Amino acid sequence: MTHFPRHRYLLSQRAYEHRVLEEAAEILEQRYVRGETFARTENTTEYLRCKLAGYEHEIFAVLFLDNQHRLIEFKELFRGTVDAASVYPREVLKEALNVNAAAVIFAHNHPSGDPEPSQADRRITQRLKDALSLVDIRVLDHVVVGKSSVSFAERGWL
């Protein structure tokens, strides 16, 4: 057990680490809401590793961005099992329109730690990109988080 100094109770090591990552993500989120952008992959992966690391099941999330690539909202849309999460383009599109997003960045974690995207990851990314393009919402990247991270944009897959 680890004592978390800001709070007066004991947490397991995993809970402690998750809490620290959440607090780091909140600090980064405030930076991006105030005007910094997600135009650089390094900014994106730094933020997403804090948000998605440490889960024992897959999480698919979306960063909804304005025209200047500033954060409107980060939202975990789908939760899955240890090695898969079902993703529904209709729900992603609905959320993007609801917050009036001009662009999005997709993200999900691989609890195994291996960030290498699967063929299923590549297929759903293309389906999402096709659906969002119908309403002029740009897909800037899809980042897979494990022990490190992989950017679809950096690999030229978008």
UniProtKB/Swiss-Prot annotation:
One of its GO biological process terms is: proteolysis
Q: Residues in domain MPN?
A: 37-158
Chain residues that bind Zn(2+): 108, 110, 121
Q: Which UniProt keywords apply?
A: Hydrolase, Metal-binding, Metalloprotease, Protease, Zinc
Q: Membrane-spanning regions, if any?
A: none
What GO MF terms are annotated?
A: metal ion binding; metallopeptidase activity
Q: Where is this motif: JAMM motif?
A: 108-121
Q: Which family does it belong to?
A: Belongs to the UPF0758 family.
The record's NCBIfam families line, in alphabetical order, gives: radc (TIGR00608)
This one is known as: UPF0758 protein VC_1786
Which species does this protein come from? Vibrio cholerae serotype O1 (strain ATCC 39315 / El Tor Inaba N16961)
Q: What is the lineage of its organism?
A: Bacteria, Pseudomonadati, Pseudomonadota, Gammaproteobacteria, Vibrionales
